[in-house]
Structure formats: C-alpha cells, structure tokens
Amino acid sequence: MPGVVRLLALLLVPLLLGSARGLHNATQRTFQIDYRRNRFLKDGQPFRYISGSIHYFRVPRFYWKDRLLKMKMAGLNAIQTYVAWNFHELQPGRYNFSGDHDVEHFIQLAHELGLLVILRPGPYICAEWDMGGLPAWLLEKKSIVLRSSDPDYLAAVDKWLGVLLPKMRPLLYKNGGPIITVQVENEYGSYLSCDYDYLRFLQKRFHDHLGEDVLLFTTDGVNERLLQCGALQGLYATVDFSPGTNLTAAFMLQRKFEPTGPLVNSEFYTGWLDHWGQRHSTVSSKAVAFTLHDMLALGANVNMYMFIGGTNFAYWNGANIPYQPQPTSYDYDAPLSEAGDLTEKYFALRDIIQKFAKVPEGPIPPSTPKFAYGKVALNKLKTVEDALNILCPSGPIKSVYPLTFIDVKQYFGFVLYRTMLPEDCSDPTPLSSPLSGVHDRAYVSVNGVAQGILERESVITLNITGKAGATLDLLVENMGRVNYGSSINDFKGLVSNLTLGSKILTNWEIFPLDMEDAVRSHLGTWGGRDRGYHNKARAHSPPTYALPTFYVGNFTIPSGIADLPQDTFIQFPGWTKGQVWINGFNLGRYWPVRGPQMTLFVPQHILVTSTPNTIVVLELEHAPCQDGGPELCTVEFVDKPVFRTVQTHRHAN
C-alpha cells in the first residue's frame, strides 16, 4: 500500500500544473477529458469507466444480449470491442453488416442495456484474429506495406473507413449513442514501421467522419519505445499491461506521454491466448483481482481484456511467429467462459468492483444449460480428390510454377496442388520446400497413396515414392494468417517452388476448393463410397496417414423435450486433425493430438429439433475407422469443455 500512496502523490502533481480543458456544455451530451483534475467528464460530471472486452465477431448474435447482460451485472459500466475489417469485407467492395456481422445492432444492444462502448475500429486490430483483422485481398498488391502510408494501403483503408465510420457516427455518445471513445490503430508502437504520417492520416479520417470533438486514443505496451512510435499529439495515449505489473512504473510511463489526464489501462489481461500444441493458458483469479483492486484504488480507468473470449469459428484464428496458429477456442481463461458461463474469476472480479462502484441489483443470468447428446456414428463419404468436381466445379488453374492462395483468390481454407512426377522414384526421394514455402500444412499423396505431411517451418522435406508420370497431389491448408508483428503479410499456399530430389517441380494444376458451398449445397449429391484407381492404392498407405476424407452422420434431438436444443461440446475420440460442420455451420478446426483444445463449442442456435442434424467432418490425416468398420468412427457430444496438452513431435501430426 505505501507504493500505491506514493504513486497517488506523484500522479496528483499535475493538478497544480494543468489547465482546465473539456468544459461541459450543458445543452448537449459530452464525453471529454478534464486535464486539470486527471479524469474523464461525462456530461460535465466526473466519470471513471470499468470496462470489459467482448468481440461481437466471436460470439453468435443469438448470445449477444446474454453476454452483455452478464457483463453489466458484474458491475461494468462499459464494454470494449474491436471491429474486424475482414469480417465485414471478405471480398473487395462486398460488405456484410447483417446477422452475426451487424455491429450496429450489437452496439445498440449494449446501449439498451445501459452500457457505454469503447470502440476500436482498427483498421488493424491484432486480437489473435486472422491477419489482425486486415482483409487478405490487400495482399493482391504483393509489395504493399501494411499499416503504413503506402498509397495502396491508404486507398483501401480510406474506402473502408468511409463505409464503417458513417455507420458509427449516430452511435457516438454526443449523438445519443453509447460510444464514448474511439481507438486509432492498435498497439502501433509494436509494429516495424514508425510512420507518423500514417497515424496522422487515420486521425484526420476519423475526425472527418466522426467530428473534431470525438475523443480519440491509442494503446501501447508499457515500454517507452513502443509509446514513442504508437503515440501522436491529439490522440490520448493509454497503456496496457497484465496482472502483477508494477503500477508505479506503468502509469508513470503513461504520464511521460500524457502529463495530465486520466490513467487508463486499455487492456488489462484477465488471461492469455493459446497455441496448438502448448498448455492451455490460465491466470489465477487472485492475481487478476489483486491488480484490479490496486488500479481502481488509484482511480484508474480499466478495460479487462478479455471479459469473454468467445470462439474462432470457421477459419478465423490468427497465428504468431515463429509460426504458431491459435486454436478454435478463444476462451482466454476470461471471467466468462467461451460458452458464456459464469466462472470463479467472474465473481472474484465482481467482488472487487463493488468496492469501488455500484453493482446492479437483481439476479445474474445463469450459465446456459449444456446437454450431452452422446455418440454419433459417421460414415466415410468421399476423399477430397474424388470430390474435386464438386469442390472446384470450374476446374483447375494451370501454371508452370505454384500460385499462392491470393493469386487464385482463395482467401481461406484449402487449395489442392497437382503435378506429375517427372521421374521414377522407386527409392524414397526427398520432396522438399527449401525455402519453407509450404504455408501452412500440405497433405501429400502420390496416385492416391498418402505419403505424409509437409509443415511450415518444422517439416520441409518428405521422402516419397512413385513412378514417372504418377499424380502428385498436395492439399494445402491455410491454418490462419499471422496477426502480430512484422510478418502479417502472410501469403498462403505454395509460396515458393518445391523440389523433387534436385529438380524443381513445374506444370501445376491448382484447384481452389469451395468447402463451404459443397458442404451446404451438394452434400446429398455426393453419392456413396470412393471409387476408381485410388481404392487399390490406398491399401498401401503408411499406417499413420490416409487421404483427406469427408465423413458424414446425423443425429436427432427429440422435439418433445422442453428447453432443447441446448449448447453442447463436440469431441473427436481417435480422430487426428480436421474441420467440422454442423448443419452447414463451420464450427472450426479440431486437432486433439496436438491440444490443448479437445472439444469444440456448439451453440444451440445451430441445432434443430424438427429434422435430423447433419455433421460433416473433413479428416485430414487419419480417422479412427480408417481401417475398420463405421461403428468405430464416432464423434461425441459432451456437456463440458476439455482442455489438455499432448506430447507432440515435429515430424508427426
């Protein structure tokens, strides 16, 4: 406590030095900074926010109100959200603001519940989200310098902000909405460039669209170099840090860049992110609560990142360098679990908050009920190779050398690369990616015989066998673009040449695969079992690997039972790695042999009681029924999430 008192004394010094700014105009709603007394003013009255992060793009719209109400009942008076550009503009000029993408409705819903909103519209957001929220199609300009004053980048950003920010303007606090502050960029000091022209460009565009009086801010880590590049005059500089940080040092660093004004931790970490193959990250409730208490005792404004993490459905997860993709779950060990459940951490933080602010009275919405629907048998349907006419109805693109995903306008998912072996490989011959050009994972086969896997940065050579003229296929998976640091220009596919022995492989056929359309529209026309020359050859595949294959099954939820359907979790006993859809909804990636995530969250709104629910699994390596009957090939619905880490090896799985 003496340290807190000493820091408080240091921080009060500017009261004698500052000049009064941000005076209240009683005729309108205002949210301003009182630089004289180091605080925010809301409608002229002192105000301190206690906020939590929630990402609308990681929580189904069906559950927005439930999660927001739980946040309010914890004592929060504000929520913070990013806006993920690529979530709204998946293809250039084609915008989606409906359904789960309706950010305006999300913000309005927070307003209706009495929550203020701290908006972080990027354009870059990090967030462990694919490419940090930047759309992959920006990479069609191969030399583009992202997050800079590169003219190509600024032109795209300018157009996007011209679409997004006018939608946000009516939702600003001054206009009757809940948005009190708006962040410019995101932790820009951590990026390779220190481009003040870029920040000034954003500052001007935000003012153009939102007004000169909007309160703009930046966020950077507690490091002087980071703040030097991330802060800009006219943008209020805030910091972010984790439990256990020295508060005196952290806030004095903010004071170096903002001598007066409120103390703000824009990202106080309640947990941490996961990577495939690593232990599930946890942070003790005691540590989070202790530091939160001390920050609130100082009068600081705090946003807890995350208050609920949510889910990276489909292909939306990001990755870090050295290449480490994040899993489907973004649980984050947050106060509300991935499924929105109340945790011990939730109540620990609520107890701290109520010492400093009024916590709403009344019942807290309970954790949603979960149901274990049990095991569901799946039948083998088709391999990816056998379904090419459905997955790529327009046929392949031909090129002497490999093309990237961006070259063929495939932004997510999978591309199959095909060529012919130029010579006999009777003895095992190295298929190599000398420049680690497989981004990110290639499932290799010769004439329908699975050979093994090439993996970015870890497995760059694989011995294969086959006759001259045999078909060499590589199904390449985009496992998520890098979302942080200097490597966010993350091209996918075969980004450099492959060699067989000493020869460069040429004359490729490239199949961009539309998995979503095939799963949603053509499932019933796929026919029965595999057929053709592949069948005989598959018997000789290495036992660890098989061709990437689709499996399908159905299960029925009784319609006469009250409160069904309910949320559930799906697990994959005996399966290896792949993608799963339920009723056409892409739940995301499973990889139980790597962990730590063993189950995938299944929200109730994608389930039905009127007809059977259809499960489609794309197993990329080896299914439990690969060598046995379909009765061995099951998935299981359970009522609790499971996280654990399995020992991994660089050469397998």
Swiss-Prot record:
PROSITE patterns: GLYCOSYL_HYDROL_F35. Substrate binds at residues 82, 128, 186, 332. InterPro entries: B-gal_1-like, BetaGal1-like_ABD1, BetaGal_gal-bd, Galactose-bd-like_sf, Gly_Hdrlase_35_cat, Glyco_hydro_35_CS, Glycoside_Hdrlase_35, Glycoside_hydrolase_SF. Residues 23-27 form a propeptide. The active site is at residues 187, 267. Its main location: other. It is an enzyme of class 3 (hydrolase). Keywords: Disulfide bond, Glycoprotein, Glycosidase, Hydrolase, Lysosome, Signal, Zymogen. GO terms for biological process: galactose catabolic process. The keyword Disulfide bond applies. Residues 1-22 form the signal peptide. It catalyses: Hydrolysis of terminal non-reducing beta-D-galactose residues in beta-D-galactosides. Belongs to the glycosyl hydrolase 35 family. Homodimer. May form higher multimers. Cleaves beta-linked terminal galactosyl residues from gangliosides, glycoproteins, and glycosaminoglycans. This is Beta-galactosidase. It comes from Bos taurus.
